[in-house]
Amino acid sequence: MRPKILTALVAGFFAICVSATSADAKPLKVFILAGQSNMEGHAAISTFDYIGKDPLTAPLLKEMRNPDGTPRVCDKVWMSYLTGPYDGSANGEGLGKLTAGFGERGNQPTKIGGKIGPEFTFGIYMEKELKEPILIIKTAWGGRSLNTEFRPPSAGQYRLPKEIQELWDKYPQGAHGVPKLEDRKKWRDDKDAASGVFYRMMIDHVKKVLLNPKRVCPEYDEQAGFELAGFVWLQGFNDLVDGTTYPGPDQPRKYDEYSRLLAHFIRDVRKDLSAPKMPFVIGVLGVDGEKNVNFRKAMAAPADMPEFKGNVIAVDTAPFWDHAIAAAMPKQGEYNNIVSTAHTLKADGTFDRDWKWEKYWKPVGNPLPQERTWRFMTIDPTEKKDKLEKYDARRFRDITLPAGMEKWYMPDFDDRTWTEGKAPIGKGVWKHSGITLDKFPSKWGEGEFLLMRTTFEIEDLNCESYRIAVLARQGFHVYLNGQKIHTYIWWQDKPQYGSIVLGKEQIKHLKKGENVLAVYANDQYDLNSPEHYAAIDVRIEGITKADQEKLDLALEEVLSPKDREALKGSSNGGYHYFGSAKIFAQMGKAFAEALLPLQK
C-alpha cells in the first residue's frame, strides 16, 4: 500500500503546484502599434551615440544598450511585426524578442534590420514597469493615409470635398491635379479599391496573432489568457500633404475630416477586436516641430470627445523635434552639393572659373586634361537582350561588345584605328538648369555607347587625396591602368562635373609614369525630345595637404563643427523625424508613459 500512498501524495503535490502556478500567472499584455512610415521607424542604430550627448536623453541610451554597447534585448517582450513595401504587395512578419532592428525593413520584412521606430523604447519601459509578459503587435507601411488606405469601415465611402468637386466640374477637359471627365470613373474605382485595404490587413493580422499567441510568445499561458492593453497610432504625413482630401489654405477647420476619420478608426478598431474600452494613444505628428498647428490639433481632437474621455490620449511628438538637426539639415544639402561637384559650368557650357570652390583641387598628370588626346569609338547594341524595348530614364547598362573588344580598357589594347579628339566628347543638346551644352571639341557619333581611352604621365604622387572629375549625362564605368575604379548606374540632369573621391583601393592603381584612363558611357534621350544627346569627359585630380586644410576651413563656414555633430544624430529626411534615434526613443517612452496609468 505504501507505494500507492506515495504516488498519491506526489500527484497531489504537483496538482497543488500547477494550480498555484496558474493562479499566480498573469494575462499576457498585448499592445498594438500601427501607422505609416514613422511607425515603421527610420532611425538608424548608427545614430544611438547622439542620444548620449544630451544630458536630458543620456539616461535613455543607458536603457537601450547593454554594458558592452550592443542594443538591449528585452527578455519579457516579444514582437510580431507585419510590414513590407508601401503597397502591401510583399508583406512579411518579423518575429522575436524585442531589440533594435524592428524599424523599417524595406523589402526584407522578416529579417532583423538596422533601424528602430518607437517600439524599442516603448517595450523597454513597459517591461520595466509591468510584471506580466508583453506582446507587441506592430503593423506599419510607408506612405499610407487615413483617408484612403487605413480608412475605417464606418467612415463610409470616400467622397471628394465640395470645393474639389466644384473644381472638377469646372474643368471637364482636365487640369493640373484634375483628371479628364472620361478618366474620373477609373479614379473613383481605384480610390474605392484602395480604401480600407491596410485597415483590414492590420485587423486581420492582429486577429491571426491572437488566435495563437504562443506562436509568437513562448511564455504565453493559455489559462491566464491575454489582455488587449493598448493601441498606439502614429501616422499623418500623407494626410497632412493631401490637398485633394483637405483642400484650401491652412486654417483651423481645414483638417476636420481627419478628426472625423480618426474617431471612426478608434471605434472600429475597438469593435473589430472586441475591446470596447481598450486604451488608445494618438501619436500626434510632430514633423517640423511646432508647425502644422491645425493638423496637429485635428489629430488630437478625438481625445477630447466625451465618448473617449479617460481612455484616448493624445501624445504630442512635436516637443521631441530636434532643432539642432533641423538647423543643420539645409546646410548639409549645400555642403553635399559643394563636395560632390568638381566643376560648374556657365550658361554657355564653358567652365565657371569664378566658382568659389574651383581653386583647391588641381589636375593630375601631363598633358593637362584639356590638351589630352582621346581615342574613341561608338557602338550600338546588336543583341536583343541589350536593346531597350521602351523608354527608361536609367539607360546605362553593359552590352555585348564586338569580338576582339572584350579587353578594350587594358593598357596594351591597340586603339590606333579609333577616332582621335579632345574632350568633352558629345552630341546633340544637353540643356538643363539654365545651362546649354552643345559645343564639343569632338563629336560622339551615331552609336549609343562610347568607348574612350587616353594616356597621361605622372611625375610624383604627393597629393593628400585624389578624385575623378566627370561630366556625364548617363552612367559610366571608369578604368585606370586596366582596373575598374568606379561605376555609376544612374544619370545626371544638370551639366556639371561631379566629384568622386577615390579610396585606397582605387588610388593604388595610379602610378608614376604613364597611366591609361578608359571610360565606357552611353547617350540619353527623353520622350519629349527623342534626339539622342550626350557629353563625356573624365579627369583625375588631386589636392595637397595644405589645400585640403584650407578647403576644410572654408567648408566650416557652410557646415560648422557643431552642425556636423548634430547631423551624427540623423540618418533620414525631416519627414521621417530625421531618422534620429533620439527622437524615436523619446516618442516610444512617451507612448508607454501615457498607457501605463491605464493598465489594470
Enumerate the language-model features and the residues they cover.
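Conserved, well-structured interaction surfaces
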Residues: 25-229, 234-366, 410, 457, ...
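An acidic-aromatic loop/edge-strand motif
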Residues: 44-57, 353-404, 491, 504-559
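Surface-exposed, low-complexity/disordered Ser/Thr/Gly/Pro/Asn-rich loops and linkers
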Residues: 411, 415-446
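Solvent-exposed beta-strand/loop surfaces of large extracellular or lumenal domains
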Residues: 480-503
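Short beta-strands within extracellular/lumenal beta-sheet-rich domains
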Residues: 445-459, 498-502
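Aromatic-lined ligand-binding clefts that engage carbohydrates, nucleic acids, or primary amines
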Residues: 418, 456-482, 517
